[in-house]
Amino acid sequence: MTAQLSKKSEAWSARFNEPVSDLVKRYTASVFFDKRLAQVDIQGSLAHAEMLAHQKIISQQDHAEIQRGMAQIQEEIASGKFEWLLDLEDVHLNIEKRLTELVGDAGKRLHTGRSRNDQVATDIRLYVRSEIDNIVGLLRDLRLALLDLAEKHADTILPGFTHMQVAQPITFGHHMLAYVEMFSRDAERMLDCRKRVNRLPLGAAALAGTTFPIDRERVARTLDFEDVCHNSLDAVSDRDFAIEFCAAAALIMTHVSRMSEELVIWMSPRVGFIDIADRFCTGSSIMPQKKNPDVPELARGKTGRVNGHLIALLTLMKGQPLAYNKDNQEDKEPLFDTVDTVVDTLRIFADMATGITVKPDAMRAAALQGYATATDLADYLVKKGLPFRDAHEAVAHAVRACVDRGCDLSDLTLEEMRVFSPLIEADIFEVLTLEGSVAARNHIGGTAPQQVRLAIARHRSKLN
């Protein structure tokens, strides 16, 4: 029986009296998605092997053999020659099996003092840390593209909306800066998340630590972790760092989705504020005239996908007792797809920002149609000494009269305006222009072109 059992392919098969069914193998295997972790798995294994040799847990010769074997495995993976086997379950055992084929007993000694539990936790942290750095860089690229667009249109009038109704005039540059602010916070969130990702689980072993005289701090230094995880149970069992990453990613996509909604609306022929370059649009298989903003529409849709992954991970963790459970195998596909979706979306949006054509005349015409300067008239009366609530009421009556007549506030004569307040004088016509309205909001965070340019300069300084 012993000889028969020793032929089984699983690393743990000696405990069992019968082989695992093929159905169970397919159901429990993760290698065809977690092989994405191959490079970080090798990176972690090399650091672990170096520590084992330094601590004299394995010999220097074994260490050299492990390094040699891992170098060949990396080449095989890069060239597509590495054979991934479902029978070996996951990325870890596939690599370990190949290493043993290449270097013999030295490969069998690599797993001394560790478990797949702390191994995979380390792999995921290395992976997430790397992707955070990548995403922060892509957020920078997107912000720079939006800053270019904002700078080009720092003076371009755009109607600002609340409740999808014209509210007050702003500039297109100011509007773009709102998204720059959102994506700046997204980058800050990612970097803050990185602090909690950047802790080393390796050395926790299965759940209780190891009896070998390991040096966890040495491995942490080798892998550029700021610290080690200080409780072995927590180190192998929790995925809160991945959940936090997915939450930050969901916020990125939420901001992208809000921008997408506006781009779709603005590109509509009924609105016509912008056009998006043909290379970011598609047509219809039946309607020859169509030019559809598929990229922002799809980004809007993919946001729900990323939100779903966040909920999946939260649900995955909520019922697990300590320590590691097989449930955690399900953390990878939502995590990987979140990364892919966010990375692809940020890349294409930074590119698409260069293909947005703004139509100032359409924006200006829309700003003239919704009594956008009504608040300016109320502020004018307040500055003349009228309490704000009284000023608000007077202007509301004026707007009502304009609605009935089908004209704008600026179309009223001075005499007609004075019907609503005797405080109104000839200087009111400077106040009621769109340019005058935006220029008057000349403070930090305001829409005045001067402030827009100062804000752009501040952001560029931070990004550079």
From Swiss-Prot:
Gene Ontology CC terms: cytosol
Record key words, sorted: Amino-acid biosynthesis, Arginine biosynthesis, Cytoplasm, Lyase
Molecular function (Gene Ontology), one example: argininosuccinate lyase activity
One of the protein's GO biological processes: L-arginine biosynthetic process
Compartment(s) of residence: Cytoplasm
EC class name: lyase
Iron as UniProt keyword: no
Pathway: Amino-acid biosynthesis; L-arginine biosynthesis; L-arginine from L-ornithine and carbamoyl phosphate: step 3/3
E.C. code: 4.3.2.1
Listed Gene3D superfamilies: Fumarase/aspartase (C-terminal domain), Fumarase/aspartase (Central domain), Fumarase/aspartase (N-terminal domain)
Reaction(s) this enzyme catalyzes, per UniProt: 2-(N(omega)-L-arginino)succinate = fumarate + L-arginine
InterPro entries named among the record's database cross-references: Arg_succ_lyase_C, Argininosuccinate_lyase, Fumarase/histidase_N, Fumarate_lyase_CS, Fumarate_lyase_fam, Fumarate_lyase_N, L-Aspartase-like
Family that this chain belongs to: Belongs to the lyase 1 family. Argininosuccinate lyase subfamily.
Name of the protein this chain belongs to: Argininosuccinate lyase
Organism for this UniProt entry: Janthinobacterium sp. (strain Marseille) (Minibacterium massiliensis)
